[in-house]
Amino acid sequence: MPDWLAVGIGGFAGAISRFQITLWLSSWSTQRFGRVYPFGTFAVNIAGCLFIGILMALAMDKKIPDVWQKILVTGCLGSLTTFSTFSYETIGLFRSDRPSLAALYVVANLVVGLIAVAAGMSIIKAIIR
């Protein structure tokens, strides 16, 4: 399979997943809190961090064929996660006079994201041993 097709297949799956998860969590936050909070972007970014930790730990041990790395990591996780939307939503929080929430959102994405990558890698290392 050509690399571009592998990335495209994964990208399609990741983009559709992000759209559906974000739509569902936006609706949930509106019903629960009366306004939309960026839970969807946070959820997909953290899930993507966890899964990239898992997949890259497997890749380091040569447990995943190269084509699946392209499908899952570059394609699916590349389109599932979104730095641009995270940045846009952060600016939106600042503009809506919620600087504390904006700062919390930035710190939470970074800290929880790093923890999720490390957790994913640790899970695989514990299983493979």
Go through the PLM ranges and name each one.
Residues 1-129:
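Membrane-interface helix-loop junctions in multi-pass transporters/channels
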